[in-house]
Amino acid sequence: KPNDVVEPKLFDIINLDYPGLEKVKSFYEAGEHYYAAHALLEYYRNRTNVTNPNINLINPTISVKDQRIADQALEYRFYVRGFYESIDENKVETYYSFFDNNTKKIDWTAHQDTETDQEFRYQRHRHQWMLPQAKAYRISKDEKYIQSWIETYSDWLATYPYEPGTQFPPAGGSENDKDYEWKGLQVAERVLSQIDIMAYFIHSPNFTP
């Protein structure tokens, strides 16, 4: 497998001498980064000595709202907390579409002309629809949820790649509008949710290095 699908820096932050990572270390030291990543994935899939108290993988549940969020995301209607395109008499929300029918691509800047609240720009980079999709996958085992997640997350990473040298000015001021996708609560919420997302998705055949 090609090494170029794996970021080598991944291994710089992992203790390769940790018990259970012997295969990972062996592949890494041989320059086989893809196989090292695959061995790392197998380690996470099979380990039993770590429990995430936030989730229940044996009897997973999902709320009606989270199921709606997961399903709307399949159509590129992404849940952005506090914002929606419309709401009906039963308080069922329809979320904004981020799909550009002209380019047939995701438009991450969509609706900024109508939703001028700065919070809208921040919240959409917190990916609040991804955890509901992970829950929906764990319950249904329907690969469409992880395929949607992979497509969307890959597109976001391609659109907003992290660049070394991101500046973190004091709170407040227009300088916070620079690189805000990689600042503060945007990053914190993504990281916290990804811990749970990984556990829900990890046994999917589509979850690969």
What are these regions (language model features)?
Residues 1-97:
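Extreme N-terminal leader/anchor segments
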